[in-house]
């Protein structure tokens, strides 16, 4: 019985070894084993445009807020160039075409506001002259100032003094008109400055889109070297 068990154990061992030898032969010859790449793996290089945009914005915001309109226009131009560096090619072209449609309307509005401001400023000057003259006339008659004409003193006639109430009303109206014109002119100046800033931003954006990469930088940047027309 013991010899039978030993023989059976030997048979099972031989069968097991034979199965292990036959397993590699079942692999197909035409199957290719995956090999690692022969080059060092590398991820795609990140775009440099966000860095350029941040550098441009840093340049625009390095100083204090622009005190003059020229400085404000300069910062608006820097912001537009930063926007071009941040946007992709398709968005740049969409914004460019929209800006080309809006710019003539903005310039027309700007011209109209300038004409309106000129009219209001002229009205302000006329009202200031009227207020000054009426103030002098009223003050002279109230103080009974005497004028020397050809060596003789001439006082303000009584009929002129009777005009003081009317001159006071005219002076009050001229002063009120001056205040209204000054307030309107300040509001127009703010609108004109805002439109000028928008015109500068849109023109700068379009100029940046049209700019070739050789003008923008010696290193090709994303999309700037091939502006679409």
Curated annotation (Swiss-Prot):
Keywords: Host cell membrane, Host Golgi apparatus, Host membrane, Host-virus interaction, Inhibition of host innate immune response by virus, Membrane, Transmembrane, Transmembrane helix, Viral immunoevasion. One of its GO terms (cellular component) is membrane. It is found in: Host cell membrane; Host Golgi apparatus. One of its GO terms (biological process) is symbiont-mediated suppression of host innate immune response. InterPro entries: Orbi_NS3 (IPR002565). It is a multi-pass membrane protein. It holds the Pfam family Orbi_NS3. Residues 13-31 have a biased composition (Basic and acidic residues). Residues 13-46 are annotated as: Disordered. Plays a role in the inhibition of host innate immune response. Interacts with host OPTN and thus inhibits the recruitment of TBK1 to the host Golgi apparatus. In turn, downstream partner IRF3 cannot be activated and IFN-beta production is impaired. Belongs to the orbivirus NS3 family. Forms homooligomers via coiled-coil motif. Interacts with host OPTN; this interaction inhibits innate immune response. This is Non-structural protein P8. It comes from Bluetongue virus 11 (isolate USA). The gene is Segment-10.
């Amino acid at each position: 019985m013991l010899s039978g068990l030993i023989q059976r154990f030997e048979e099972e061992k031989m069968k097991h070894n034979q199965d292990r030898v036959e397993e590699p032969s079942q692999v197909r010859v035409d199957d290719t084993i995956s090999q690692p790449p022969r080059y060092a793996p590398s991820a795609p290089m990140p775009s440099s445009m966000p860095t350029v945009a941040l550098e441009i914005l840093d340049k625009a915001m390095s100083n204090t807020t622009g005190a003059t309109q020229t400085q404000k226009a300069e910062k608006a131009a820097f912001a537009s160039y930063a926007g071009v560096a941040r946007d992709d090619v398709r968005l740049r072209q969409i914004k460019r075409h929209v800006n080309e449609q809006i710019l003539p309307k903005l310039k027309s509005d700007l011209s109209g506001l300038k004409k309106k401001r000129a009219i209001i400023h002229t009205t302000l000057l006329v009202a200031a002259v009227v207020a000054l003259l009426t103030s002098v006339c009223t003050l002279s008659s109230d103080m009974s100032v005497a004028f020397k004409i050809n060596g003789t003193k001439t006082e303000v006639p009584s009929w002129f003094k009777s005009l003081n109430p009317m001159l006071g009303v005219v002076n009050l109206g001229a002063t009120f008109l001056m205040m209204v014109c000054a307030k309107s002119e300040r509001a127009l100046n703010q609108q004109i400055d805002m439109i000028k800033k928008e015109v500068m931003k849109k023109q700068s954006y379009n100029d940046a889109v049209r700019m070739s990469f050789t003008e923008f930088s010696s290193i090709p940047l994303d999309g700037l070297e091939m502006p679409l027309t």
